[in-house]
């Protein structure tokens, strides 16, 4: 977190001695818990994912941790849909050209396309993945495939067609959208190997956690035209 000031928070917590801490993306460290003192009973996370809270430290101190899964799922799904549109229409490039006075840029664009009939591939088919699938399938007429080791086809109906492996998502999709939590197993689990599986015309969307992706390898994949576009709602740092 660019704005995280642990020392400042520690001083405030020492003064306040709170019974509860509410956070969103700010890290909650063991030192901060100790600064709050024995009054601290609960830490609340606004949203899903607990990777910014030291769960082991909270458990050791008998501090309850609660969160709100699904609280912002619709917003994240809509953001992912926007990023798909931005990639398909080369939104950032066209915007920069217009702002510089190049109003004829549209006549030279050859790699923009519609979403209808394209394939969206989901890595993770939880709440956000299913909401994005609904937008893509019902709103844009896209085909939707997905990989999720914790779900079976009957749980998804005809909304998402599950494939046998994550690799198949990367191979088949025109848009790969990442919706997985950050865990020791998923950290940097997406890199050049996965990007090289993708179609050279495909786009990569990440609206989950930045650290799941090896960012240096994503930049390299873009620079070497391994994939066409990346739409990022999150970054590593």
Annotate each predicted stretch with a short phrase.
Residues 41-44, 64-66, 145, 203-205, ...:
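Structural detector of well-ordered beta-strand residues that form the stable sheet scaffold
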Residues 69-119, 131-139:
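Phosphate-binding beta-alpha-beta segment of Rossmann-like dinucleotide-binding domains, i.e.
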Residues 138-143, 224, 228:
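Conserved S-adenosyl-L-methionine
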């Amino acid at each position: 977190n660019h704005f995280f000031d642990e020392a400042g928070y520690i001083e405030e917590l020492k003064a306040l001695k709170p019974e509860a801490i509410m956070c969103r993306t700010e890290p909650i460290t063991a030192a901060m818990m100790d600064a709050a003192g024995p009054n601290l009973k609960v830490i609340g996370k606004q949203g899903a994912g607990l990777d910014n809270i030291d769960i082991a430290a909270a458990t050791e101190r008998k501090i309850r941790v609660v969160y709100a899964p699904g609280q912002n799922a619709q917003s994240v799904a809509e953001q992912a849909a926007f990023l798909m549109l931005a990639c398909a229409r080369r939104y950032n490039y066209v915007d920069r050209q217009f702002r510089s006075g190049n109003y004829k840029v549209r006549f030279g664009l050859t790699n923009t396309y519609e979403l209808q009939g394209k394939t969206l591939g989901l890595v993770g088919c939880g709440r956000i993945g299913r909401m994005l699938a609904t937008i893509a399938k019902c709103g844009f007429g896209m085909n939707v495939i997905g990989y999720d080791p914790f779900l079976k086809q009957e749980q998804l109906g005809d909304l998402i067609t599950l494939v046998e492996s994550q690799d198949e998502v990367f191979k088949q999709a025109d848009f790969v959208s990442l919706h997985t939590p950050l865990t020791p197993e998923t950290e940097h689990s997406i890199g050049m190997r996965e990007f090289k599986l993708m179609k050279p015309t495909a786009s990569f969307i990440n609206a989950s956690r930045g650290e799941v992706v090896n960012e240096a390898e994503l930049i390299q994949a873009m620079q070497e035209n391994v994939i066409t576009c990346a739409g990022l709602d999150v970054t590593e740092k």
